[in-house]
């Protein structure tokens, strides 16, 4: 180990041994000194390490099949949508890694439009993709956006959410994913341009065009318009992947008319239902134009994929199969109180039926289970005599209380204790 000073009493760098006269700067710490040259060397080593991590993060992009396989672990069904998303995401990051040009051929950006009913898995798919790729991710609601100059959020606020998700690391944010939900709500109210100002419709589509395509945007770090004198953050949106999603209620009749079918036909109910279910998969850009999206906006979303409404079987699978399945989560929570939880098959089907009746899809499953489990989860942590709790179909319908199996083998119905 180097001494802190030599025979002449000159201070030395504790790492390289150079004296204070041989270097430009010597920084003192508790019982240790480091020179500017060693600081520079350490900085280079750290930057090299961070650079290689960044390289792995964006260059080792999983292949489309690998992406689809990971999506399968978290999202049930929607195979066509998963395939389309896997290919689009893979191509997007391949394009980034090739610097957008191969042999003077410029590769276009693959922004994605997902069309599907509420609770069909649009947001979950986008979130899971960002987790697979380990990139910053932000969700924005199109209904809160308005044109500049009107009350509401500017489109730049979407970019601020992504920058915040990347901990203000602009380089990372520039390779992130933004999911814009309820995109159908900014459609023009009429197919023909109106003289009346459409503050939250066509104007917002126009405002989104540049950031979807790729531009250097100026983002207010504090958001909104309340701080006009703040310095702006510059961010290049060229390599940000935008995924837009919406239910697009009213799109099916437009597709039917294009296919030459009457909106109200004479086919059997079963056949009509099958056709209705498959209609969204036949969507074309021209249908979206008739719905109220402007041509330039549709052109910025080249990948269009549709999600099917989830049927009873799919909802039951969602409850039990994914890695983060709701039933597994509730089982784990009760397990922490030394109680085993069991949902009977018919109970799961009853929960699925309720979600379909409410038209909430997978999104409504948690609130249904929460309502069933609330009293049980309030009471059981205070009881030490319960070994197992069984949720039956009658429990879900509200006809009977959950069954409790005590440690001595006795089976009783749960009785809600009311406070005096």
Swiss-Prot record:
Residues 1-54 form the ClpX-type ZB domain. ATP-dependent specificity component of the Clp protease. It directs the protease to specific substrates. Can perform chaperone functions in the absence of ClpP. Belongs to the ClpX chaperone family. NCBIfam families: clpX, PRK05342.1. Transmembrane segments: none annotated. PROSITE patterns: CLPX_ZB. One of its GO terms (cellular component) is HslUV protease complex. This is ATP-dependent Clp protease ATP-binding subunit ClpX. Component of the ClpX-ClpP complex. Forms a hexameric ring that, in the presence of ATP, binds to fourteen ClpP subunits assembled into a disk-like structure with a central cavity, resembling the structure of eukaryotic proteasomes. ATP binds at residues 117-124. GO terms for molecular function: ATP binding; ATP hydrolysis activity; ATP-dependent protein folding chaperone; protein dimerization activity; unfolded protein binding; zinc ion binding. The gene is clpX. SMART domains: AAA, ClpB_D2-small, zf-C4_ClpX. GO terms for biological process: cell division; proteolysis involved in protein catabolic process. HAMAP family: ClpX (MF_00175). Zn(2+) binds at residues 13, 16, 35, 38. InterPro entries: AAA+_ATPase, ATP-dep_Clp_protease_ClpX, ATPase_AAA_core, Clp_ATPase_C, Clp_protease_ATP-bd_su_ClpX, ClpX_bact, P-loop_NTPase, Znf_CppX_C4. Coiled coil: none annotated.
């Amino acid at each position: 180990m180097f001494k802190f000073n030599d025979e002449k009493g000159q201070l030395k760098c504790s790492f390289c041994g150079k004296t204070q006269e041989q270097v430009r700067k010597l920084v003192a710490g508790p019982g240790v000194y480091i020179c500017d040259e060693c600081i520079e060397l350490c900085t280079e080593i750290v930057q090299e390490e961070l650079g290689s991590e960044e390289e792995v993060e964006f260059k080792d992009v999983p292949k489309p099949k690998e992406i689809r396989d990971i999506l399968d672990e978290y999202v049930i069904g929607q195979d066509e949508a998963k395939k389309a998303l896997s290919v689009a995401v893979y191509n997007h990051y391949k394009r980034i890694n090739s610097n957008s040009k191969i042999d003077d051929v410029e590769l276009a950006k693959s922004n994605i439009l997902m069309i599907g009913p509420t609770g069909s898995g649009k947001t979950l798919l986008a979130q899971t993709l960002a987790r697979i790729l380990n990139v910053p991710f932000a969700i924005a609601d199109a209904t809160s956006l308005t044109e500049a100059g009107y009350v509401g959020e500017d489109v730049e606020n979407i970019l601020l959410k992504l920058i915040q998700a990347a901990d203000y690391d602009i380089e990372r944010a520039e390779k992130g994913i933004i999911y814009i939900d309820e995109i159908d709500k900014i459609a023009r109210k009429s197919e023909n341009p109106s003289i009346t100002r459409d503050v939250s419709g066509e104007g917002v589509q126009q405002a989104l065009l540049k950031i979807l395509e790729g531009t250097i945007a100026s983002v207010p770090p504090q958001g909104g318009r309340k701080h006009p004198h703040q310095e702006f953050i510059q961010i290049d949106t060229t390599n940000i992947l935008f995924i837009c999603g919406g239910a697009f209620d009213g799109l099916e009749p437009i597709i039917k008319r294009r296919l030459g079918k009457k909106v109200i036909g004479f086919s059997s109910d079963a056949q009509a239902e099958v056709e209705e279910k498959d209609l969204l998969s036949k969507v074309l850009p021209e249908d979206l134009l008739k719905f109220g999206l402007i041509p330039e906006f549709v052109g910025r979303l080249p990948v269009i994929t549709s999600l099917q409404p989830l049927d009873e079987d799919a909802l039951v699978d969602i409850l039990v199969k994914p890695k983060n399945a709701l039933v597994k989560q509730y089982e784990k929570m009760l397990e922490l109180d030394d109680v085993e939880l069991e949902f009977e098959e018919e109970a799961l089907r009853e929960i699925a039926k309720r979600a379909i009746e409410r038209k909430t899809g997978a999104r409504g499953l948690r609130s249904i289970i929460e309502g069933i489990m609330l009293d049980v989860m309030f009471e059981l942590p205070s009881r030490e005599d319960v070994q197992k709790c069984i949720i039956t179909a009658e429990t879900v319908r509200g006809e009977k209380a959950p069954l409790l199996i005590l440690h001595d083998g006795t089976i009783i119905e749960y009785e809600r204790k009311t406070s005096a």
